[in-house]
From Swiss-Prot:
Chain's gene name: TLCD3B
Catalytic activity: sphing-4-enine + octadecanoyl-CoA = N-octadecanoylsphing-4-enine + CoA + H(+); eicosanoyl-CoA + sphing-4-enine = N-eicosanoyl-sphing-4-enine + CoA + H(+); sphing-4-enine + hexadecanoyl-CoA = N-hexadecanoylsphing-4-enine + CoA + H(+)
EC number from the UniProt entry: 2.3.1.-
Secretion signal span: none
Membrane-crossing residue ranges in chain numbering: 130-150, 159-179, 194-214, 223-243
Tissue: Expressed in testis. Expressed in the retina with higher expression levels in the macular than in the peripheral region.
Keyword vocabulary terms for this entry: Cone-rod dystrophy, Disease variant, Endoplasmic reticulum, Golgi apparatus, Lipid biosynthesis, Lipid metabolism, Membrane, Transferase, Transmembrane, Transmembrane helix
One Gene Ontology cellular component: Golgi membrane
Species annotation: Homo sapiens (Human)
Protein name in UniProt: Ceramide synthase
Record's disease association: Cone-rod dystrophy 22: An autosomal recessive form of cone-rod dystrophy, an inherited retinal dystrophy characterized by retinal pigment deposits visible on fundus examination, predominantly in the macular region, and initial loss of cone photoreceptors followed by rod degeneration. This leads to decreased visual acuity and sensitivity in the central visual field, followed by loss of peripheral vision. Severe loss of vision occurs earlier than in retinitis pigmentosa, due to cone photoreceptors degenerating at a higher rate than rod photoreceptors.
Boundaries of every TLC domain copy: 34-261
Biological role: Involved in ceramide synthesis.
Source organism superkingdom: Eukaryota
Length: 274
């Protein structure tokens, strides 16, 4: 178990540092540290997402029996990804800190900042990214132990499908980069926004009904009968995982309304949301 976790603890921070230093030091680029940190953090998140979704696809398509079939990659990648969530909490804080500095709320260097300003930035970070930090902490403290201990080698198919939820992450990361650099008017941003909306809907929101349907097909049950046929704690866990996805999907839909129908002429649906 330790080998994949150690590997993850080296790969993700190492990739971040490599990307940041490359963007800062290449003569053709010479990016500012803030820009290099933000883009590097998004790059690492995208790489992790591609790796996770690829592993998930391999596992889910290899498990013909959705309960009993096993694939070594399910446990190996789960262990490998644990350090990513810990790293990403810190990487998100670095992005928030640099954005705070760029906006002019801090001094030009660390010594120039007022006492307590770092704590104020940390509180602002936790306030703004509370749900994401909570999600990452739950992945490490709850989901990982459950996947290793409670599953007892069962349900690799379902774990593979859950890993494929990361398909939407590269589009989310690219969208954030384009917004950060005021590229909302570009065709790339609009195409990426449409792909982000579609991938998030299919791979994160509709994923849960699909998993219930897959189990119902395996057990010979109609979809609506599945929640009553499985343990209550499974339904509770699915609801807790689905809830933040629905919230984030709402934010994506609201952003899509503002992108494709500016406020000067919003459609009735957007007016109702505003």
């Amino acid at each position: 178990m330790l080998t994949p976790m150690v590997a993850g603890g080296v790969v993700f921070p190492g990739l971040f540092l490599l990307s940041k230093n490359t963007l800062q030091r290449l003569p053709q680029l010479r990016w500012e540290e803030a820009d290099a940190v933000i883009v590097s953090a998004r790059l690492v998140s995208s790489v992790q997402a591609i790796m996770a979704s690829t592993a998930g696809y391999i596992v889910s398509t290899s498990c013909k029996h959705i309960i009993d079939d096993q694939h070594w990659l399910s446990s190996a990648y789960t262990q490998f990804a644990v350090p990513y969530f810990i790293y990403d909490i810190y990487a998100m804080f670095l992005c928030h800190w640099h954005k705070h500095q760029v906006k002019g709320h801090g001094g030009d260097d660390g010594a120039a900042r007022a006492p307590g300003s770092t704590w104020a930035i940390a509180r602002g970070y936790l306030h703004k990214e509370f749900l994401m930090v909570l999600h990452h902490a739950a992945m490490v403290l709850v989901c990982f132990p459950l996947s290793v201990v409670w599953r007892q080698g069962k349900g690799d198919f379902f774990l593979g499908c859950m890993l494929m939820a990361e398909v939407s992450t590269p589009f989310v990361c690219l969208g954030k980069i384009l917004i950060q650099y005021k590229q909302q008017h570009t065709l790339l941003h609009k195409v990426n926004g449409a792909l982000m909306l579609l991938s998030f809907l299919c791979c994160r929101v509709l994923l849960f009904p699909y998993l219930y349907w897959a189990y119902g097909r395996h057990a010979g049950l109609p979809l609506l009968a599945v929640p009553l046929a499985i343990p209550a704690h499974v339904n509770l866990g699915a609801a807790l995982l689905l809830a933040p996805q629905l919230y984030w999907f709402f934010l994506i839909c609201r952003g899509a309304c503002r992108l494709f129908w500016p406020r000067s002429r919003p459609p009735p649906a957007c007016q109702a949301q505003d």
